[in-house]
UniProtKB/Swiss-Prot annotation:
This is Uncharacterized protein HI_0082. Residues 1-22 form the signal peptide. InterPro entries: AcylCoA_DH/ox_N_sf, AcylCoA_DH/oxidase_NM_dom_sf. SUPFAM superfamilies: Acyl-CoA dehydrogenase NM domain-like. GO terms for molecular function: flavin adenine dinucleotide binding; oxidoreductase activity, acting on the CH-CH group of donors. Keywords: Signal. Disulfide bonds: none annotated.
Length: 88
């Protein structure tokens, strides 16, 4: 909608008043879209954003679960291979 982060938070809170799940889903979809917008390639943005708009889909975030809990990793490409660094 082109609004500010504060206004986005207000929309999330308003949705959550009626349904915490709806508020969380809305927020997480927008977080995923923002990550793609900031870091995705042009081709990936075209593919995902057109799917969201044309098919009314939602974006999502996924985390790996190694061992006994959810772990957050940052990936980087070096020496022709993907590498993961634990950040939490």
């Amino acid at each position: 909608m082109g609004l500010t982060l504060k206004e986005h938070a207000e929309v999330c809170m308003a949705l959550a008043e009626s349904s915490a799940s709806a508020g969380l889903c809305y927020m997480m979809s927008n977080v995923a879209v923002n990550c793609l917008n900031l870091f995705g390639s042009y081709q990936l943005k075209q593919k995902i954003f057109s799917d969201i708009v044309q098919n009314k889909t939602f974006a999502a975030l996924a985390y790996s679960e190694l061992g006994t809990g959810t772990h957050f990793y940052s990936s980087f490409y070096i020496n022709m291979a993907w590498n993961l660094v634990k950040i939490m």
